[in-house]
Amino acid sequence: MRKPSSSAPVSRSVGRRTVLAAGAGAVAALGATATSARAATARPAARPVSLTITARPAAEAERLRLAQALRGSEFQPTGLYAPAGTPLSLTVQPCDGLVPTLWIGAWDYYGEITEPRSYPLTAGANTVTDPHGGPVYLTLTGHGERAEVKFRSGTVPMPVFTLGRTTEADYQHQLDTLTAAPWVELHAPNTIMTLSREGALLYRGEDHAALLRLVETIIDSHARISGLDGSKPVHRRKAGPYHFTEVSKVPTGVGAYATHGYNGFPRAYLDRATTVEGLRTRGWGLYHELGHLHQQMAYKPGGLTEVTVNIYSLAAQRTLDQPSNLLTVDPATGLTAFQTSRAKFGTAGLTYEKSFGAYEKLVPLRQLELAFGDDFWPRLHKLVREENPQSDYTENDKRYRALATYSSRIAGYDLTGFFVDTWAFPIDAVGRAELSALNLPQPPVDPSTLTD
């Protein structure tokens, strides 16, 4: 049974992170449309590569709209690699007045080079020389405006598999011939997966269309439990894809992590992130880290950072017809998390944060679904987006109160007994008064008695 991730403080410009313990023609599906052929393989591209990029809302604006804790990616991939110290020449034509930003490099929070470098562009000719090199991306902030970008020299094409466009044979040919770039990418409508060449070659025998369809299914499971059904503008999915990146290193005891803009996976995790069977049957870590990019801030006190994230992990398991991790039998006790947590109810000194283990803490969140329907969490996410209450990272009491009051409002019942008396959540006197003021009836069934 995989351990949950633990939060870590801000120490670099990418911001707060959470960690899990324990070519050019390929980019059309992601928003940038290529209009010229790939360049030669072994040296910076000799022929121009032209792209049309369409503007999207900024990642921070999307985070605020979705009431989430972390920003998602706003990168639009080009399928190109810029060698270190090589002048990159490109021309920009802003069709609708907006000029894109160029980014070069890979995300790698714990590595030597931690993040891509940004280069604001101007209309007309531009030359950029990046000291480190890396995959090339563009961003264009807006709402559907377009810009045309022509890469004239200074790049080489990366091997790229794009779902629905690239055949497996073509991708394998790219891996064999496009050897100048040390990076490889897999693209789908909601996915960018950036791998080192060595990492990609480890599992080159996989069915990459099936792999990307599976990743898209997992992303869809997270969107559905989040109530991102497009019923109102505020309930649209985030603009652009999610970015999964192979990283060079993680701290001892860390398996993978999530932070603003991407999920990071070391090579040791690729057997579960880039193989169909591994991701389908042992991919909890990816489900979990992607969940961090969906967590809403309003009801996520520090003590729940590694708990509410698994609302999304469980949703992925159900979507993939996996048995729930909450039903895993602890070999030491012979009991599931439902059973071991129930045995603690009513004991002296019981506190939610200190008395229950990682999976036991997840049990009450699952019991709310069992009691009040599969649409419980989608409805709660929607209400939080529509009201968008604000809280500072330090206001843990406020966010615990929000969890209890929003849950009671969605259920239509007073859940004081469930949260305070049974599970011993730290709901303060203000929170108990807020619950009382809702004037809701008692639930007909005690949710704490329910199990999968």
Where are the model-predicted features located?
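Fold-level signature of zinc-dependent metallopeptidase catalytic domains
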Residues: 133, 137-225
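N-terminal export signals
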Residues: 18-38
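Catalytic cores of extracellular degradative/oxidative enzymes
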Residues: 182-371
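Beta-strand-enriched, solvent-exposed domains that form extended recognition/catalytic surfaces
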Residues: 40-159
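N-terminal secretory signal peptides
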Residues: 1-14, 24-30
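Beta/coil-rich, acidic/histidine-enriched accessory regions frequently appended to metallopeptidases
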Residues: 2-3, 40-49, 399-452
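Structural helix-adjacent loops and short alpha-helical linkers that scaffold large soluble proteins
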Residues: 318-327, 369-379, 408-418
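Active-site neighborhood of glycoside hydrolase catalytic domains
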Residues: 356-391, 395-401, 410
